[in-house]
């Protein structure tokens, strides 16, 4: 199956979300792109997260990483982020892409694959 064929199956592309401390955002984003685990990461520098942790309500400024990647690469992406992340239990979740511009979906699949083959 070619990348173009895969682009027609939008489920082959996922968006992953990961929050992190602002000073770590660019490092984590670059890591997953350089490792060929993602085609692109948007860094939203400041989001407010309100959550319960160890019985207490926390209110923190974080950065949000919006990661475009192949669905197949998500397990490795998740594990890489978990290992490199400063939090004990980082948010790393995957959302399936239901639809998108076919040329963009094809690019996501190709760019991530290109990154992995360049490192080989």
Residue ranges with predicted function:
Residues 1-120:
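Positively charged, small/polar-rich N-terminal and surface patches that mediate targeting and assembly
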């Amino acid at each position: 199956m070619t990348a173009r064929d895969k682009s027609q199956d939008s489920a082959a592309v996922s968006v992953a979300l990961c929050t992190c401390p602002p000073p770590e955002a660019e490092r984590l984003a670059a890591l997953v792109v350089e490792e060929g685990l993602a085609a692109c990461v948007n860094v939203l520098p400041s989001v407010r997260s309100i959550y319960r942790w160890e019985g207490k309500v926390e209110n923190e400024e974080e950065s949000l990483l919006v990661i475009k990647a192949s669905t197949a690469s998500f397990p490795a992406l998740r594990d890489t982020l978990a290992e490199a992340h400063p939090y004990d239990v980082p948010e790393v979740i995957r959302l399936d892409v239901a639809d998108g511009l076919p040329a963009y979906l094809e690019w996501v699949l190709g760019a991530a694959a290109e990154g992995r083959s360049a490192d080989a």
